Amino acid sequence: MVLGILRNLLDDNARDIKKLSRQVEAINALEPEIQALSDSDLQAKTPEFRRRLERGETLDELLPEAFAVVREASRRVLGMRHFDVQLMGGIVLHQGRIAEMKTGEGKTLVATLPAYLNALTGRGVHIVTVNDYLARRDSEWMGRIYRFLGLKVGLIVHGLDAAERREAYNADVTYGTNNEFGFDYLRDNMALHPEEMVQRELNYAIVDEVDSILIDEARTPLIISGMAEKPTEMYYTVAAIIPRLQPNIDYNVDEKAKVATLTEAGVAKVEKMLGVDNLYDDANMELAHHVNQALKAHTLMKRDRDYVVKDGQVIIVDEFTGRLMFGRRYSEGLHQAIEAKEGVKIERESQTLATITFQNFFRMYDKLAGMTGTAATEEEEFRKIYNLDVVVIPTNKPMIRKDYPDVVYRTEKGKFEAVVEEIRERHAKGQPVLVGTISIEKSERLSEMLKKRGIPHQVLNAKYHEKEAEIIAQAGRLGAVTIATNMAGRGTDIILGGNPEALAKEKMRQKGYSPEIIAAATAIKVDEGDPEVMAARQDYQQFLAAARRETEEEHRRVVELGGLHIIGTERHESRRIDNQLRGRAGRQGDPGSSRFYVSLEDDLMRLFGSDNLTGILDRLGMDDSTPIDHPLVSRSLEQAQKKVEAHNFDIRKHVLEYDDVMNKQREIIYRQRREVLTGADIRPTIEDMIKTVVDQTVDRFAGESKYPEEWDLAGLLDYAEQLFLPGCDREALANAIKEMEKEEVYGFLREKAMEAYRQREEELGPETLREIERLILLRVVDTKWMDHLDAMDQLRQGIGLRAYGQQDPLVAYKFEAYQMFNDMIASIQEDVVRYLYRVKVVQPQAERPRQVVENRYAGEASGPRQPVRREHKVGRNDPCPCGSGKKYKKCCGAGK
């Protein structure tokens, strides 16, 4: 059965490649004709293609010629000609699919083909990378092709102001990170004026390292938040009592599910220490939450594995890359609980203002495509969640890397000793070795062992920056030993013998040249009129010639030694991450090899491996230093990985099912908010709101009765005066209503409310009133949406308990979320009407600056991943967020 499915998938892929080959032949047939064009004729192709699109030609019809033009432009500007397999990858991306291309096959260059073709429509193309360094590098490097062909290139990175962002989004091709694109979408949907918005429509996105962004980061919510008014003392109080609890008596820990729970004895002990009668009483809900988070912080969150303490701050370690995630924070008070545990200053909790997950953000694009070296293992998830097919593109040259079988040891100590011994043997020969670890803790342990043996090496496990890319680029040099967390330096090729261009640029930096001069001097086309650039160019060429002589000799020797050798010190939960590590070797037909070392004490085997395994090995009498070669071990390893992959897929699918409910609500609110922001006249909307509020007020106080004498007339008049009839003649109204039927009352009060509304319009003037209406509506919607997000979050946290009452939690969540959404809409209408009839016009305030500080939160692996947070504070002189029209310091901020 499984073999049949696999055969079908392979057959499908072979059919795809055959079709793609025919399109590649059509592109290649145009090459002589395109090569014969002058630079100006080649550049004139862009306006010609645009005219042809206007006349009705499709992008698919333009594809062969457009791809041929990009290939020729790349050859002239960068000195790089797209291979046939790169053309195939480009076609797949244009079709809105995922191209799986092995490491070193030039994915960065592939993206230029569909990006150019789709940019011809004028609707914009977003190329999404995993970090600012790659976005900046690719926009400068590949940007030369687009600029040569007359397209504008934009770059979205952290630190740009609104005008710079708008300009970057208005470019034909925009490079940026997934976080920046997502945050700009959220900020645009919090804008109070159309000119504050920066993004255009979400037309076409090409996601580089698509598996990292759409799978690994899938559960990461992007969150814009403001400071919540919550005290921090309770965190310290609770942190002090947790160490006094005893494991397995007062609490139990399930590492596999990543859950820690108090036993009945533990609850009683905590209640006694905190001086409360019932920890789970309604009045103590917040206290119970503090206790649960503190327990998690002390038992499940490990220092130097999940986080580090640096300069008095708790900094999260990315579980996939091992990098320090500066600015990210765990959510729901977990980060504060860890800060209390470690005795550092506690930062205040935040309140969510706007949020979206990457899953839902990227599904909003009209067309989505991606590329990666490893996607086939997650093909089912890409298809089910994102409706994306995966096409495996063949390598340009045959893959000759040797992947050796895993070596399994009984203990971690025995495993690491064997790893160090293999590194020593290969280093002694001069063969470069790249060692992948899964945590900072493990990489530092291995580094200490290598130091004791006198083996020189580089360790990479910090925040991504250019230096890391350079070290990774030189990891193929003779005798190099590099220890890196599994994905550090992703996006940078390891060239056997070393990278001569990088070595030459390093020499120029040492000589004191600025980054701008280095970039100008190393370009294919140089400004010959600039003497400083020409002098730098001369130095670069000398350094490059010397570096080439050095690296060519090293390349020859490294190839003879078998190329780069990869050592994995532990199997990751996902086979895909293991394949990424392996993929660092054997690029572009180079030789290479890989081997994984595993111990039965590794988390994967300990938590998900076969329970029978240890007993069998005990009976066999295996010692720590003897590798285990048994089919049961290999089988157990593979089953453990499949088990975890299936478990993680189920979690992501489950999260999406819940998030889809919120997503539909978000789409409605943001769509209507955008209409208010950009629409010419919102008077009809306001009139509808007034009529709805009048009708709801009558229904609330009249109930089912048709007769006024049975109504709560005093309540009705109080509410009407409060909302839409300020300063009304209550006695006259009461007398009039007593003589009417219920249906007449609706019409009577509507007319009275509209009369008061028209009076407001005369007082303030139509133009002023429209602007006031717009601001009130936006402010009220934002405030209510913020409260709704908190309420939905609380509903979500507690909904799982419905299963105990034989209720499907998802069905219950959908039903209650729908009710809450309707209540929010009614509340928005009431508040808008109330403010509208009472607002006073004050002098306009200076436009407030956007103060946005990045601050991310993350949940444990079984819940949502680390949300990426950005915060902003209301300035004392800003308009108050409540919509009153007063300054914050004279309204809700009084006395603060």
Swiss-Prot record:
A GO cellular-component term linked to this record: plasma membrane
Superkingdom of the source species: Bacteria
Region span, Disordered: 853-896
Cofactor(s) the protein requires to work: Zn(2+)
Subcellular location: Cell membrane; Cytoplasm
GO biological process entries: intracellular protein transmembrane transport; protein import; protein targeting; protein transport by the Sec complex
Main location: membrane
Keyword Metal-binding: yes
Annotated ATP binding sites: Q86, G104, E105, G106, K107, T108, D493
Record note on cofactor: May bind 1 zinc ion per subunit.
InterPro entries with a match to the protein in the record: Helicase_ATP-bd (IPR014001), P-loop_NTPase (IPR027417), SEC_C_motif (IPR004027), SecA (IPR000185), SecA_CS (IPR020937), SecA_DEAD (IPR011115), SecA_motor_DEAD (IPR014018), SecA_preprotein_X-link_dom (IPR011130)
Molecular function as annotated in GO: ATP binding; metal ion binding; protein-exporting ATPase activity
Residues that hold Zn(2+) according to the record: C880, C882, C891, C892
Disulfide cross-links: none
Keyword terms: ATP-binding, Cell membrane, Cytoplasm, Membrane, Metal-binding, Nucleotide-binding, Protein transport, Translocase, Translocation, Transport, Zinc
Protein known as: Protein translocase subunit SecA
Source organism of this protein record: Moorella thermoacetica (strain ATCC 39073 / JCM 9320)
